[in-house]
């Protein structure tokens, strides 16, 4: 959370000074753009507690097939069964997903060097956003966390407990 905020502040400052629009590239899109071929790619980052941040993309066109989400790894089952094959998983959650679904038909292991987030994937996803005219002003560039930070979750739990105690 903090690293993302610091990175966004740096990008926004540079873009504002240069009067340049920003491409808000999701991590899942950057992972997907780092590989090519036929079939489907799922960008998956380990969100801990048996969950992954994930999104599905067409491997040939990199067209987004699902929104970014934070869900239990088992929640991908319907998408995994129905998507175009072959299917590969990339990101630091790739092994978790692959081990969960490797017995499904059409699931392929991804070579380790292609599983990591690479600058080329970020650049290609950003260029696609530029070409599509979906870049935004620095003021409009905002983080998308997909879930509350641990500190925010703990505060909400304390507030709920206090609310229950006063009722």
Regions found by a protein language model. Name each.
Residues 1-20:
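DPxDG-like acidic metal-binding loop motif
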Residues 9, 16, 52-53, 151, ...:
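General helical structural elements
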Residues 110-167:
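Acyltransferase
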Residues 20-117, 131, 145, 150-151:
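Surface "functional belts" at beta-alpha junctions
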Residues 10-14, 31-32, 122, 126:
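Buried hydrophobic packing segments
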Residues 3-5, 99-101, 157:
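Short, glycine/acidic-enriched capping/hinge loops at junctions between secondary-structure elements
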């Amino acid at each position: 959370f903090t690293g993302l905020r610091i990175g966004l502040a740096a990008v926004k400052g540079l873009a504002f000074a240069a009067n340049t629009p920003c491409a808000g590239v999701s991590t899942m899109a950057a992972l997907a753009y780092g590989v090519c071929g036929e079939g489907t790619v799922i960008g998956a980052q380990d969100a801990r507690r048996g969950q992954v941040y994930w999104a599905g993309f067409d491997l040939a066109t990199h067209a987004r097939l699902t929104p970014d989400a934070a869900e239990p790894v088992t929640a991908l089952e319907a998408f995994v069964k129905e998507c175009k094959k072959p299917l590969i998983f990339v990101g630091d959650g790739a092994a978790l997903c692959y081990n969960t679904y490797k017995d499904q038909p059409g699931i392929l292991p991804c070579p380790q060097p292609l599983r990591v987030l690479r600058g080329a994937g970020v650049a290609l996803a950003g260029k696609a956003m530029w070409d599509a005219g979906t870049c935004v002003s620095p003021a409009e560039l905002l983080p998308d966390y997909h879930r509350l930070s641990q500190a925010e979750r703990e505060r909400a739990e304390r507030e709920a407990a206090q609310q229950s105690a006063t009722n």
